[in-house]
């Protein structure tokens, strides 16, 4: 078995509280990337486009409270701006899904979600397999799915797009996609995972019931196709 980290990885993760605190120090105090979080958080390539705290939060190596107070210290000594606001917002969003789980219990695992929607969903194994393997009609989806398979990581922007494609375009039972994420993600958290999948799939808390335009998203967030080329390079020949 090859345990080497893929050289393309945006997040060569190492577990434990010591590594979590090291990441906090680097992202906040040494590189001061927190000051630019709002502008970079939808990035796709590189280790510093987002905070990458989620795996350590998921396994308890660091707490939201610890990160929150470190942000407050940063705001006092370095800078308070929209970026510091947005990182706090994301911590609150994460806790919000925990409260959704507490309120609704096992409904988060039901096909109709917390809204108890009666939609028709498919469950084709071949469609699911092609999605997992990055073999769909959308290169942007494929690149993100290959990144997940190779590294256990996917950007927030990527997760929204592949989930929307799975549930809204392929009409597949969203829980199948959520379960695959559960099996693959370094930062799997039951509340965030199933909460976000419900949200994207139209059976959760989003009142707009949106469907992502995958090609528009790719053009906006990967306009030069750098991310797609990075992960699809081995599938072009």
State where each predicted segment sits.
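Long hydrophobic alpha-helical segments that form multi-pass transmembrane helix bundles
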Residues: 1-35
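C-terminal catalytic domain of photolyase/cryptochrome flavoproteins
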Residues: 7-11, 15-19, 38-237
């Amino acid at each position: 078995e090859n345990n080497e980290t893929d050289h393309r990885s945006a997040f060569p993760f190492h577990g434990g509280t010591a590594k979590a605190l090291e990441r906090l120090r680097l992202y906040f105090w040494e590189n001061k990337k927190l000051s630019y979080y709002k502008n970079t958080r939808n990035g796709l390539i590189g280790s510093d486009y987002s905070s990458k705290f989620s795996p350590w939060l998921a396994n308890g190596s660091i707490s939201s409270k610890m990160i929150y107070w470190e942000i407050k210290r940063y705001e006092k000594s370095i800078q308070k701006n929209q970026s510091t606001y947005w990182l706090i917002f994301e911590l609150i969003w994460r806790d919000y899904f925990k409260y959704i789980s507490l309120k609704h219990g096992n409904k988060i695992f039901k096909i109709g979600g917390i809204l108890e929607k009666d939609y028709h969903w498919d469950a084709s194994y071949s469609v699911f397999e092609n999605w997992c393997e990055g073999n769909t009609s959308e290169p942007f989806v494929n690149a993100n799915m290959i990144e997940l398979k190779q590294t256990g990581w996917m950007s927030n922007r990527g997760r929204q797009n592949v989930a929307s494609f799975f549930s809204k375009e392929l009409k597949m039972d969203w829980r199948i996609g959520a379960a695959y994420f559960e099996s693959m993600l370094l930062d799997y958290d039951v509340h965030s995972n199933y909460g976000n999948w419900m949200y994207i799939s139209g059976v959760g808390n989003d009142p707009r019931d949106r469907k992502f335009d995958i090609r528009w998203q790719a053009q906006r967030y990967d306009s030069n196709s750098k991310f797609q080329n990075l992960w699809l390079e081995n599938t072009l020949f």
